[in-house]
């Protein structure tokens, strides 16, 4: 089957549109987190937005042979506008889990049936990434809802995302003693990027 006559063409454009919109929603949410001085959540939304941009580009690149054409799609896309940060995180979690299952597996199955193995592989692998995104947003929402984003029941490491200072205690310090940034920049060391072996 040719891509121009396929359902996969439409699914790729739907996925491109969805990833592009997710990127913008997360960029908007990052700005809101920054206003609320939740810089750790700002960083996670920005980090995830950049990954969504990459997903959009992957799906778009699968459509290159159709350059110059207009692909009509019909789809529903979420409006996630809330002032409550935990609610924004929960909405993001929900949307990511929908892409994980059922949306991208169904798109992948269609691509496979139509003979587009590389496209099917992209949908399958990206669906697993979306699961990770959903889990990440859910973990942060849990901590925020429990009042434990900057507190712990046990001593643990806390890293300042601005300068890298690591503090050990049951909670993040109010201010970083090195760079003077507020506690909104601290993340549990176990959740900090690039710290694993």
Give residue spans per PLM region:
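Non-heme di-metal
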Residues: 1-197
